[in-house]
A protein has these predicted regions:
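Long, low-complexity intrinsically disordered segments that are proline/alanine-rich
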Residues: 19-25
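Eukaryotic helix-grip
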Residues: 25-290
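Bacterial N-terminal signal peptides
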Residues: 2-19
């Protein structure tokens, strides 16, 4: 469910195919400390805004912060079955863009409304990490719950994207769920380890050192909100990810992909979540949500 990933991969894969590889190939890229610091600053400021939203039911959803007319239109569209997508950007305290040297920060919001399901059914599905490989395939090749303590989860995803070339990643994530009241929950997911897999599914399979790879995905955080209201559940997800930058001289060609394709990926994630919940509501899902 994280997974607004295929977009970033597609953009970077295209860049690799259209640019000369540096000595030793694209695997020479290194995640530098200053890049990590910039990403962490971006996350910290974003979480400060999210903390304010989840502190009270009337501010809970991101769309609740829209001006009144726009908010009414957005909620009506969600209730009609539309999928809301918006590109977000967090700036520093002086309003300046936060630049991650040698990297790109991708930040998108997706929202859906699923009628006829409860908050408990929704939580049951999204916490069933052993079945995420069924819900979010083909990008999620394998999913596994490693440990759970109350509302804290440690999970594993094996991710794969086939586009021009094939990229496989082994990833670990810490996920934390927070109850606000009986109708409002939210969660936060943090990648703790992302390793690119070379020669995947062969006897020569091995992981490249984390942070010393092709830069397809260095970090990804996901922020989910769940609100039971109006006869169903509103679901929002913000995805913040860090990838390598676009090679010099190709921005004119690659930038449109970087700015638009992440939207398509998160749209897939939200749509798959809604589809699985709807199937469970109608009794057509093997996951049997809420049972």
């Amino acid at each position: 469910m994280l997974l607004a990933l295929q977009s970033q991969w597609l953009a970077i894969l295209l860049a690799f195919q259209l640019s000369p590889a540096p000595p030793g190939g694209v695997s020479n890229l290194e995640l530098k400390p200053e890049t990590t610091r910039a990403f962490n600053q971006y996350v910290q400021l974003t979480e400060a805004r999210i903390n304010g939203e989840v502190s009270a039911p009337e501010k809970f959803l991101y769309v609740n912060g829209y001006p009144p007319e726009r908010r009414s239109q957005a909620l009506a569209a969600l209730q009609r079955g539309d999928l809301l997508m918006e590109r977000l950007q967090t700036t520093d305290r002086s309003g300046q863009t936060i630049v991650a040297p040698g990297a790109l920060i991708h930040h998108w919001l997706g929202a859906v409304f699923v009628p006829g399901v409860t908050l408990q059914q929704t939580l049951t599905l999204v916490e069933d990490y052993n079945h995420h490989q069924d819900i979010y395939k083909p990008e999620v090749v394998r999913s596994r719950l490693l440990s759970r303590q109350d509302n804290d989860f440690q999970i594993f995803y094996r991710l794969r994207k086939k586009k021009i070339i094939t990229v496989t990643l082994n990833t670990n994530h810490d996920v934390h769920y927070f109850p606000v009241d009986s109708k409002h929950w939210y969660s936060r997911s943090y990648s703790t380890r992302i390793a690119e897999v070379a020669d995947a599914d062969t006897p020569k399979e091995h992981e490249k050192p984390a942070g010393h790879d092709g830069g397809f995905l260095w970090r990804i955080n996901s922020y989910w909100k769940f609100e039971e209201k109006d006869g169903g559940v509103y679901i929002e997800c913000e995805s913040i990810s860090l990838t390598r930058d676009i090679p010099t001289g190709l921005g004119w060609l690659i930038k449109p992909f970087v700015t638009s394709i992440p939207k398509d990926s998160l749209q897939m994630t939200m749509g798959s979540t809604r589809t699985a919940l709807t199937a469970g509501r109608n009794g057509n899902s093997k996951l049997e949500i809420g049972k």
